[in-house]
Amino acid sequence: MKLLYSNILPLGTNENQQTITDCFEEQLSKADRVEIAVGYVSRASLDELNSLVDKYNIRNICLNIGMYYIEGMPEASYHTALKLNKKWIADGIGEVRMIRSFKYHGKIFCFYKNGEPFSAILGSANLGVLKMEASNRRQYELSALTTDISECIEISDHILKLKMPNCSANIGDISDMPLIFEKNTALSGIELVTEVPPSNVEFY
């Protein structure tokens, strides 16, 4: 097991330590398939994952998202995940699944080559660790990398169980996804800009 860190002062990484983000990309560069199960995602991290999948020519990927079906999903993240799901299906490489049976709060990333898992990252980091934003820039995460084959197989088996129909479904097949509508504050406080009341929005 190798510990992986966030690089946030005053607890910055030293020359012998590796960040979670750098390790993820390093393992992805060696893989042809990746299986991911996390609690939360962000729009920026979904875009970053898509870029990395293209960069390293990943042939098979499944992203399982665990908390939103019960808690509700931010609208922007939902539409980004839906778009990514459509792209991966069209490219024939994978899908985005939502865990529906319970709130899943695990965070695991399993990497494969030629059909066999060779490494896995597990710990506190959700997908958002791939792309720092204002909301998580000061959020310290700690994870670990394992290359123990028996542990990797156990983690792989766990993710495959999450993908079963009794636990999850493809995001595109879910018609009752609860969404959280986010307020756009980009024009708040700007002179001559008036906010339209919700009742007027519904009318139009």
Describe the residue ranges of each PLM region.
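PLD/PLD-like phosphodiesterase catalytic module centered on the HKD motif
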Residues: 1-204
